[in-house]
Amino acid sequence: MACSRPPSQCDPTTLPPGPPAGRWPLPFSRRRREMSSNKEQRSAVFVILFALITILILYSSNSANEVFHYGSLRGRTRRPVNLKKWSFSSAYFPILGNKTLPSRCNQCVIITSSSHLLGTKLGPEIERAECTIRMNDAPTSGYSADVGNKTTFRVVAHSSVFRVLRKPQEFVNRTPETVFIFWGPPNKMQKPQGSLLRVIQRAGLMFPNMEAYAVSPARMQQFDDLFRGETGKDREKSHSWLSTGWFTMVIAVELCDHVHVYGMVPPDYCSQRPRLQRMPYHYYEPKGPDECVTYIQNEHSRKGNHHRFITEKRVFSSWAQLYGITFSHPSWT
């Protein structure tokens, strides 16, 4: 059968084509040198890439495991504005009506949710305070001998709104004089569907004696700026959530000439507490998590968002003399 291709491709004895005119095969030694050079170049590129990747991994690891070093950070940041001079007019807006948040108390007490208050019999002393401030859904029923009943202000986080409103007999009707201050990110408080503000408004219509305010978006930003100014840390970039204690302390400084805090431990408490000693995080949850486990895990965790309880306490300690804040049960400065 005849081959339809050119003769040079049909003849099995034909040698493969040689190099183009004017070019000769490279000597073996030169080809070997070029192959060695290419291999060295590839090795160099690999080493450089490996070094860059290693640097990135180490940088990410250091960033992820970075711990708040409050003492060194604060020295590099400017001192924040005096909280006593913060504008109060548009900071807290009424949930219903056009009332204005009461703006002055001489002596205030903050009753924390700490189990350190159990067995203290502080109830009568707390009842005599001019203004009392409580947080979230910390109850007084069944604990009044230690924590009292009087509640002038209750600062409530967005995450605790439903826990508070589900128990109106405890939190609304029991102390009708209570003024509620709700705080939360604007995207949670005012989102188009399922707005927490609407939920609180409906509760206000059901309980006409309920006086409630919300922290304005502008003031929420001020709280963030204050945290950054005090710690040198951006709240969002450091994956931090400000705690209700942070909001409560700042609000107390704004409202009160003197502040006494019951049940808050000092920032170094967990490093000195005996390991076998266990204290519930909340006085009303005896089987709840241990306080130091909660503090330490939140302080050092970098996945998700966490409260920096220990860092916040260091800030509060620095405010004690400046704003007339005292601490007891346990006592510290």
Swiss-Prot record:
<dbReference type="GO" id="GO:0009312">
    <property type="term" value="P:oligosaccharide biosynthetic process"/>
</dbReference>
<keyword id="KW-0730">Sialic acid</keyword>
<dbReference type="GO" id="GO:0005737">
    <property type="term" value="C:cytoplasm"/>
</dbReference>
<comment type="similarity">
    <text>Belongs to the glycosyltransferase 29 family.</text>
</comment>
<protein>
    <recommendedName>
        <fullName>Alpha-N-acetylgalactosaminide alpha-2,6-sialyltransferase 6</fullName>
        <ecNumber>2.4.99.-</ecNumber>
    </recommendedName>
</protein>
<comment type="function">
    <text>Transfers the sialyl group (N-acetyl-alpha-neuraminyl or NeuAc) from CMP-NeuAc onto glycolipids, forming an alpha-2,6-linkage. Produces branched type disialyl structures by transfer of a sialyl group onto the GalNAc or GlcNAc residue inside backbone core chains having a terminal sialic acid with an alpha-2,3-linkage on Gal. ST6GalNAcVI prefers glycolipids to glycoproteins, predominantly catalyzing the biosynthesis of ganglioside GD1alpha from GM1b. Also has activity toward GD1a and GT1b, and can generate DSGG (disialylgalactosylgloboside) from MSGG (monosialylgalactosylgloboside).</text>
</comment>
<keyword id="KW-0735">Signal-anchor</keyword>
<dbReference type="GO" id="GO:0001574">
    <property type="term" value="P:ganglioside biosynthetic process"/>
</dbReference>
<dbReference type="InterPro" id="IPR038578">
    <property type="entry name" value="GT29-like_sf"/>
</dbReference>
<feature type="transmembrane region" description="Helical; Signal-anchor for type II membrane protein">
    <location>
        <begin position="44"/>
        <end position="64"/>
    </location>
</feature>
<keyword id="KW-0472">Membrane</keyword>
<keyword id="KW-1015">Disulfide bond</keyword>
<dbReference type="GO" id="GO:0000139">
    <property type="term" value="C:Golgi membrane"/>
</dbReference>
<dbReference type="GO" id="GO:0006486">
    <property type="term" value="P:protein glycosylation"/>
</dbReference>
<feature type="topological domain" description="Lumenal">
    <location>
        <begin position="65"/>
        <end position="333"/>
    </location>
</feature>
<feature type="glycosylation site" description="N-linked (GlcNAc...) asparagine">
    <location>
        <position position="98"/>
    </location>
</feature>
<keyword id="KW-0808">Transferase</keyword>
<keyword id="KW-0328">Glycosyltransferase</keyword>
<keyword id="KW-1133">Transmembrane helix</keyword>
<keyword id="KW-0325">Glycoprotein</keyword>
<feature type="disulfide bond">
    <location>
        <begin position="108"/>
        <end position="256"/>
    </location>
</feature>
<keyword id="KW-0443">Lipid metabolism</keyword>
<dbReference type="GO" id="GO:0008373">
    <property type="term" value="F:sialyltransferase activity"/>
</dbReference>
<feature type="region of interest" description="Disordered">
    <location>
        <begin position="1"/>
        <end position="27"/>
    </location>
</feature>
<keyword id="KW-0812">Transmembrane</keyword>
<feature type="topological domain" description="Cytoplasmic">
    <location>
        <begin position="1"/>
        <end position="43"/>
    </location>
</feature>
<feature type="compositionally biased region" description="Polar residues">
    <location>
        <begin position="1"/>
        <end position="12"/>
    </location>
</feature>
<keyword id="KW-0333">Golgi apparatus</keyword>
<dbReference type="InterPro" id="IPR001675">
    <property type="entry name" value="Glyco_trans_29"/>
</dbReference>
<dbReference type="Pfam" id="PF00777">
    <property type="entry name" value="Glyco_transf_29"/>
</dbReference>
<dbReference type="GO" id="GO:0009988">
    <property type="term" value="P:cell-cell recognition"/>
</dbReference>
<dbReference type="GO" id="GO:0001665">
    <property type="term" value="F:alpha-N-acetylgalactosaminide alpha-2,6-sialyltransferase activity"/>
</dbReference>
